[in-house]
């Protein structure tokens, strides 16, 4: 019961205080707005621009319907966010990319042995937040492969929770 969600990422050239957006001066940030929208930002790394994107925008698609180009609606949502919350970042658009999240219903990972086959391990989908957990997930998966188990409690990530739905 996974769903594919289209995500659009944007990089901007801030209109002022550009040094404040450099990775040495700014952390990654997450924004949970009162209207339910979520955004995240990342500082300028390697002079690629200040990155801004919505997190879980709810545009579910099929794998055959993925439009890899950003559009005016995508850009407008992010520009409006910048105008209200980080106006000095709301400069020239440098680049945009489209990627996908593969979401479970509860937006959590699957890290488990395949039912009825202890020789197969399912690791993911990560529902849009797996990358930052890569070292821990890698450690856990290597323990599952080598030791056929881990000391970490993986009950929250069991595939069985999704099979009940």
Predicted regions and their residues:
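Active-site substrate-recognition segment that forms the wall
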Residues: 1-119
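C-terminal catalytic lobe of FAD-dependent flavoproteins
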Residues: 80-165
């Amino acid at each position: 019961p996974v769903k594919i969600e289209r995500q659009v990422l944007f990089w901007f050239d801030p209109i002022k205080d550009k040094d404040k957006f450099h990775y040495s001066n700014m952390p990654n940030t997450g924004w949970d707005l009162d209207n339910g929208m979520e955004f995240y930002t990342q500082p300028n790394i390697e002079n690629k621009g200040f990155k801004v994107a919505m997190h879980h925008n709810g545009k579910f698609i099929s794998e055959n319907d993925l439009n890899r180009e950003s559009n005016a609606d995508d850009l407008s949502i992010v520009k409006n966010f910048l105008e209200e919350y980080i106006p000095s970042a709301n400069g020239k658009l440098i680049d945009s990319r489209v990627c996908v999240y593969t979401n479970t219903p509860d937006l959590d990972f699957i890290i488990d042995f395949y039912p009825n086959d202890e020789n197969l391990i399912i690791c993911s989908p990560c529902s849009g937040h797996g990358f930052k957990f890569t070292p821990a997930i890698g450690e856990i998966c290597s323990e599952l492969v080598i030791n056929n188990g881990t000391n970490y409690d993986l009950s929250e990530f069991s595939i069985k929770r999704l099979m009940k739905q």
